[in-house]
């Protein structure tokens, strides 16, 4: 189906209409001229996914009413009188349950009140309180200096040895240390100290609850976790606690299921779109719709951003296919033609491409133009030039990597990363999300062009996404014949072993996070939710690539989480 069959956007840009006859290039179907991608077929049943559009988990009206009532109760809890440490712990639980977005203003108001409180006796000698206060304030945009931890060091400048026995304090210090900036050496020391000591005691912690929290944190710190994924885990964990607040737990479950129901409807519509494009029948490229929807929920899960998710998932699904064309399937001549067409944003010359590649190209054009039309209709802003520019820049980066491969050129790590932080493709998703969410008073041609120029916040996001991708996919992609990745570039450049190269890249990840953390506090033309989109795309990558390539290959851990986050609602007690 042509997205522009009846669209008025043709006045803005030449409409892309379905082409009845695409002249195939000689040898189009000749497998000996193509490298094999060896991708496994999708394990998801697309008929089932499509059915979610109409038969998804419908939340009962009584549960909606109950959720509204409980929401007011939780709001009263947050604003109620209690000891400062208890207030911090409540806010921490609310956030981990995935409810921060429901109480954003109340949480910030309470935290600011605690920040302005001149009394420090309640936290200054309490490692848990100091670290929890530090993390929650920084997470919510209130700067706290690192030297609040100086009081926990001895005369020699090291963390006091007796802190090794304070497991809860160590855990809070560990989580706080991940919000550090470049140059904050004390937080680097805190990260090393807490990590070492938590690893030493993790198997001997007497409290089962605390032990599980420690192991979970060592596997993935909170600051690197996607909120929606973390909420699903923590709801189950919170239910096991001795001092669980039953109404808070009930509200978390209800809200999770309500949002899940909305996501299911979106996923069903996207699955239908995907099947209608016909691209699901192309065997030489990845079919990644489900993974991309999970990624979309990591980027932004809140119900009001359905259009952002829809555009992000469609673009990401097409990006995966275009990436495969450049990396594996297309000849250099075809890639030159493809890039030129995208750069001109004009399909003249498409008849020089094979039918399979033309289908992908036309779907890309139609989808981008439809997103542009929706922006014009809903926001009165022509976003097509900016979306087209992002696609063109991405394809040029892909082409450079293809030329490296075909010529046998081996880039330095720095050269590779400069290209790779854009070729990882998230600039396109971020540009589109910016166009969809920036306030109309601030949305201008110049501001959108600035996002496309890859400013520092977007740059750190791209760099981290690239590094995580390479750590998880490097070996498999080299086996498929892809261009060298950062690990191989470093090995070639320095003579390091693969193990040493991986450690170096992991070090770059930590440093890039520090840069990202600082960007969150610097003066910037960006505001929420766009700032959050940049951080959250990285958290999605961290999840998919932490144990290998959970994106290209649907591994057990990604499928299990997808089922629990998107398909299966959280069971409620019978009285609920």
UniProtKB/Swiss-Prot annotation:
EC number: 4.2.3.-
Protein name: Beta-bisabolene synthase
Residues the record lists as binding (2E,6E)-farnesyl diphosphate: 286, 323, 327, 466, 469
Domain of life the protein comes from: Eukaryota
Chain residues that bind Mg(2+) 2: 323, 327
Binding site residues for Mg(2+) 3: 469, 473, 477
Protein family per UniProt: Belongs to the terpene synthase family. Tpsb subfamily.
Disulfide bridges in this chain: none
BP GO annotations: diterpenoid biosynthetic process
Function description: Produces almost exclusively beta-bisabolene and only traces of alpha-bisabolol from (2E,6E)-farnesyl diphosphate in fragrance biosynthesis.
Keywords on record: Lyase, Magnesium, Manganese, Metal-binding
Species whose genome carries this gene: Santalum austrocaledonicum
MF-aspect GO terms: magnesium ion binding; terpene synthase activity
Ligand binding (Mg(2+) 1): 323, 327
Notes concerning its domains: The Asp-Asp-Xaa-Xaa-Asp/Glu (DDXXD/E) motif is important for the catalytic activity, presumably through binding to Mg(2+).
Co-factor: note: Binds 3 Mg(2+) or Mn(2+) ions per subunit.
Motif interval(s): DDXXD motif: 323-327
Cofactor dependence: Mg(2+); Mn(2+)
Keyword Phosphoprotein: no
């Amino acid at each position: 189906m042509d997205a522009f069959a009846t669209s008025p956007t043709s006045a803005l840009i030449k409409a892309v209409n379905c082409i009845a006859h695409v002249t195939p290039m000689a040898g189009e179907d000749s497998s000996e001229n193509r490298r094999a991608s060896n991708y496994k077929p999708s394990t998801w049943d697309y008929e089932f996914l499509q059915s979610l559009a109409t038969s998804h988990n419908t939340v009962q009206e009584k549960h909606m009413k109950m959720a509204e009532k409980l929401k007011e109760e939780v709001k009263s809890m947050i604003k109620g009188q209690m000891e400062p440490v208890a207030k911090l712990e409540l806010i921490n639980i609310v956030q981990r349950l995935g409810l921060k977005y429901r109480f954003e203003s109340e949480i910030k108001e309470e935290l600011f009140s605690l920040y302005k409180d001149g009394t420090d006796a309640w936290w200054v000698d309490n490692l848990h309180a100091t670290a929890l206060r530090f993390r929650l304030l920084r997470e919510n945009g209130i700067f706290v200096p690192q030297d609040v931890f100086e009081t926990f060091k001895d005369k020699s400048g090291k963390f006091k040895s007796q802190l090794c026995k304070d497991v809860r304090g160590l855990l809070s210090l560990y989580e706080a240390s991940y919000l550090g900036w470049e140059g904050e050496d004390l937080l680097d020391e805190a990260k090393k100290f807490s990590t070492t000591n938590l690893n030493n005691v993790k198997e001997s912690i007497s409290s089962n609850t605390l032990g599980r929290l420690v192991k979970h944190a060592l596997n993935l710190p909170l600051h690197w976790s996607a909120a929606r994924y973390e909420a699903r885990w923590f709801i189950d964990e919170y239910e096991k606690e001795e001092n669980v607040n039953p109404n808070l737990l009930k509200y978390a479950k209800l809200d999770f299921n309500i949002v899940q129901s909305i996501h299911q409807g979106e996923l069903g519509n996207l699955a239908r779109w995907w099947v209608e494009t016909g691209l699901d029948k192309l065997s030489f490229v990845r079919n990644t719709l489900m993974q991309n929807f999970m990624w979309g929920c990591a980027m932004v899960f809140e119900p009001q951003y359905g259009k952002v998710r829809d555009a992000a998932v469609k673009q990401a699904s097409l990006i995966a296919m275009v990436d495969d064309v450049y990396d594996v399937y297309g000849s250099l001549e075809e890639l030159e033609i493809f890039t030129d067409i995208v750069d001109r944003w004009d399909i003249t010359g498409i008849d020089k491409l094979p039918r399979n590649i033309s289908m992908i190209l036309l779907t890309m054009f139609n989808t981008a133009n439809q997103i542009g039309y929706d922006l014009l209709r809903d926001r009165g802003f022509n976003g097509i030039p900016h979306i087209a520019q992002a696609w063109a820049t991405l394809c040029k980066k892909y082409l450079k990597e293809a030329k490296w491969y075909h010529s046998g050129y081996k880039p330095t790590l720095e050269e590779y990363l400069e290209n790779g932080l854009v070729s990882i493709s998230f600039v396109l998703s971020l540009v589109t999300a910016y166009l969809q969410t920036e306030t109309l008073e601030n949305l201008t041609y110049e501001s959108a062009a600035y996002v496309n120029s890859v400013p520092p916040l977007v740059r750190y996001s791209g760099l981290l996404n690239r590094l995580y991708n390479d750590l998880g996919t490097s070996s498999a992609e080299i086996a498929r014949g892809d261009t060298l990745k950062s690990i191989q570039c470093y090995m070639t450049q320095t003579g390091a072993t693969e193990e040493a190269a991986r450690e170096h890249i992991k070090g770059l990840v930590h440093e890039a996070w520090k840069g990202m953390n600082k960007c969150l506090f610097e003066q910037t033309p960006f505001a929420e939710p766009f700032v959050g989109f940049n951080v959250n795309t990285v958290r999605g990558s961290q999840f998919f690539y932490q144990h290998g390539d959970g994106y290209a290959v649907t591994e057990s851990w990604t499928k299990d989480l997808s089922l629990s986050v998107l398909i299966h609602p959280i069971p409620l007690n019978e009285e609920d």
